[in-house]
């Protein structure tokens, strides 16, 4: 049993909600003793099944507290036999207490003293003003952009914030790396939940808020705001499954869709038309829709534009705006450094999304192009996200990739920079709270795409998994694929694995690392060894390696 007070819009309701999660058969009856006890305490006769009885008890307890009974609902979660009862709330203490007493009622443990205390709990809530901690529309004075998806959220958030700031506006954003006001870090850590959004929206300097939003915050606390003006949904892939009752990618998409569901009717939702799961969320949206695609001939794009909508698409190496019969060139990918002239397709996806969001904010085409052109893939603008260095004739690609699709993109991009006949060494691993299937998938991708695989262990991110277990799963997959001879013999941390790969490499080789833990130490080592950002050093060599 779990009771959770969700302070903002969530997967159950687009308002603050209490979630009461139970392990329960849908037709499980109310025990006879509980029915008799409830009749004595509340003077009511319960329906026969728990699933029918609990909403009635919640309603009666609200009345006894002096509150209007809310409309309660049930939802089956992905975890077998897990059901969630949910209802809206306004006062925290009494709302949670009602959930606790509802469970006690079904268990036959409800007593009159507990029920009689509810008005006092409500009065205390009101004295303390213990209400949902989210930013209501009447308290929000600036435009807000919500950014969600599985991969690319932080990069898209950073890029859009840079575009806004480059045109002269004060911008605040929150992301996995912290809360920033005009580029200055004011809170360090992962702030993709409601606390980060509240901090940005409360800052008196900020004129535009860009709010990266991860599924964890939505599931555990709800959104940190009532609505946004523009939202972006990038993609959905299998990540963080089997957590908090979410076991399928379809339900994961629904959780992330909360960000686009709360976009104001007069606002704009930006959806990636290349991802069928993202495109399917159109039915949940109340705002206008803008689509993006890396295929100008995508049927969804053509139908959307023909129906009066607009889209930002990749057409060869141009990024263009399609609206009605017009085709407007926004910029060429050679002028978008973060895409490495279009080689990094997953970064192109982020550029398209940020561009559509910028246009939705009223940013001019010229300001958009200027912002994209000055956002470089380095530690100044996008630390840890596809940062490429040339070092002694080798390429080192450092990226935050942490799942199967991220690793696949990392390998494909790294290969695109290499000349034939050279080797790609890949450092692979992820956080321990991922499903076993994620480690299996990483093993398959590494076995298929790398010439040499270094399995990494990150103790800081074991998150309950025994040390060595994730590495063992990946090792078994790679060996079963006949690629055991391409495995480095021991698992190392990120920094030591990179040193080992560098020592074994030759000029012309590339080393790609899934780096989530030791970024700063790695960047320091590369700097001390004289490595240069590849976009700067590429001019000295057509192959992209230092001369």
Regions found by a protein language model. Give the residues of each.
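P-loop NTPase switch/communication element
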Residues: 177-192, 196-198
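Extreme N-terminal, non-catalytic leader segments
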Residues: 88-142
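Residue-level signal for inorganic ion chemistry
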Residues: 174, 212, 234, 270, ...
């Amino acid at each position: 049993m779990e009771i959770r007070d969700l302070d903002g819009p969530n997967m159950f309701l687009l308002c603050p909600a209490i979630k009461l999660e139970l392990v329960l058969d849908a037709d499980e009856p109310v025990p006879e003793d509980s029915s008799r006890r409830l009749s004595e305490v509340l003077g009511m006769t319960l329906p026969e099944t728990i699933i029918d009885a609990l909403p009635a008890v919640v309603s009666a307890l609200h009345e006894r507290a002096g509150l209007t009974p809310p409309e309660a609902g049930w939802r089956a979660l992905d975890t077998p036999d897990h059901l969630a009862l949910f209802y809206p709330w306004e006062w925290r203490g009494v709302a949670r207490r009602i959930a606790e007493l509802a469970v006690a009622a079904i268990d036959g443990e409800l007593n009159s003293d507990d029920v009689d205390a509810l008005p006092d709990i409500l009065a205390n809530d009101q004295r303390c003003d213990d209400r949902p901690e989210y930013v209501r529309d009447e308290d929000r004075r600036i435009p807000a952009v919500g950014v969600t998806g599985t991969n690319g959220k932080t990069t898209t958030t950073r890029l859009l914030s840079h575009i806004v700031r480059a045109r002269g506006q004060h911008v605040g954003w929150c992301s996995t790396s912290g809360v920033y006001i005009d580029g200055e870090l004011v809170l360090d850590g992962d702030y993709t939940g409601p606390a980060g959004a509240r901090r940005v929206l409360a800052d008196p300097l900020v004129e535009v808020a860009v709010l990266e939003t991860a599924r964890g915050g939505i599931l555990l606390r709800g959104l940190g705001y009532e609505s946004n003006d523009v939202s972006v949904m990038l993609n959905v892939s299998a990540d963080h499954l089997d957590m908090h009752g979410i076991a399928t990618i379809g339900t994961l998409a629904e959780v992330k869709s909360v960000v686009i569901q709360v976009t104001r009717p007069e606002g704009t939702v930006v959806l990636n038309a290349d991802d069928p799961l993202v495109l399917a969320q159109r039915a949940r949206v109340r705002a206008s829709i803008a689509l993006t695609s890396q295929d100008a001939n995508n049927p969804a794009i053509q139908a959307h534009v023909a129906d009066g909508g607009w889209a930002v698409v990749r057409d060869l190496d141009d990024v263009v705006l399609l609206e009605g019969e017009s085709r407007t060139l926004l910029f060429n990918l050679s002028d978008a450094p973060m895409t490495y002239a279009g080689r990094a397709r997953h970064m192109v996806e982020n550029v398209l999304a940020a561009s559509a969001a910028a246009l939705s904010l009223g940013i001019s085409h010229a300001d958009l192009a200027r912002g994209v052109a000055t956002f470089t893939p380095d530690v100044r603008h996008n630390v840890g996200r596809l940062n490429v260095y040339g070092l002694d004739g080798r390429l080192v690609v450092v990226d935050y990739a942490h799942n199967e699709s991220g690793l696949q993109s990392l390998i494909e991009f790294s290969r695109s920079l290499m000349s034939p006949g050279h080797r790609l060494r890949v450092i692979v691993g992820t956080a321990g709270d991922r499903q076993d299937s994620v480690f299996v998938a990483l093993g398959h991708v590494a076995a298929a795409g790398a010439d040499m695989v270094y399995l990494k262990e990150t103790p800081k991110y074991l998150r309950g998994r025994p040390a060595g277990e994730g590495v063992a799963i990946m090792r078994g997959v790679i060996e079963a694929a006949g690629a055991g001879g391409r495995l480095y013999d021991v698992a190392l941390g990120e920094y030591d694995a990179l040193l080992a790969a560098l020592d074994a490499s030759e000029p012309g080789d590339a080393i790609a690392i899934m780096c989530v833990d030791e970024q700063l130490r790695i960047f320091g080592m590369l700097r001390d060894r004289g490595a240069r950002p590849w976009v700067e050093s590429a001019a000295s060599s057509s192959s992209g390696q230092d001369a």
